[in-house]
């Protein structure tokens, strides 16, 4: 039986060693490395990719969300599970957008943690279940509303919610569980889950695309970023150079969304 290779990163050594101890007692797991900071974790994971990386969400030397972004962008075969201080809806939402497959708090029971790691190793997304809560559904709706203006600027390359997806989210946000959503919308629970999975994928791809957009905007001359046309105190670029820049941006966004 091929073992699930796990990398651990958490600044609290006793907690990290506790997870190591739990995993070492299971035949299907192998801890391939561990560290106290996420920046070093990323370097070690790149050198020897595990099946799963378990990272602290908040780390003084490297934010877990940023490292999750980088892992999922550069090493898509590596799944990430984030360790959270508490189950806060806004932090869970950030974890979802980063591309994490799951998250857990430090008071999670060992058996439940083992279950989470096993289902993530099979390619499942336990974090998706969080989108069935009213608070998270409301945050998702707001996120897509806020992205509308940016999406116009980049030619509609960001993913929008489909009408059915928005309907499902609105129904969840109105404090309905999945069974009630299925009844109210005359959909099967499987169909609802498929739509939620699509929404999750859109959140991740949009967040990656926004990172690219913000980075490219910072590289533009200031008069373009501000929308001003006073060239006296600004660097001059030709129309051809600007069109080339736009084309490169579009290609990078397409590669993230496809």
Q: What residue spans do the PLM features occupy?
A:
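Conserved acidic segment of CheY-like receiver
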Residues: 2-15, 19-23, 53, 161
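Conserved phosphotransfer microenvironments
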Residues: 38, 54-68, 88
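Short amphipathic alpha-helix used as the core "switch/output" element in two-component signaling
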Residues: 65-77
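Short, flexible helix-to-coil linker/hinge segments that flank and couple to helix-turn-helix
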Residues: 93-96, 107-156, 220
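Regulatory hinge/linker segments at domain boundaries
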Residues: 138-170, 224-236
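Recognition helix of helix-turn-helix DNA-binding domains
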Residues: 174-210
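Basic, Lys/Arg-enriched C-terminal extension of HTH/homeodomain DNA-binding domains
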Residues: 200-258
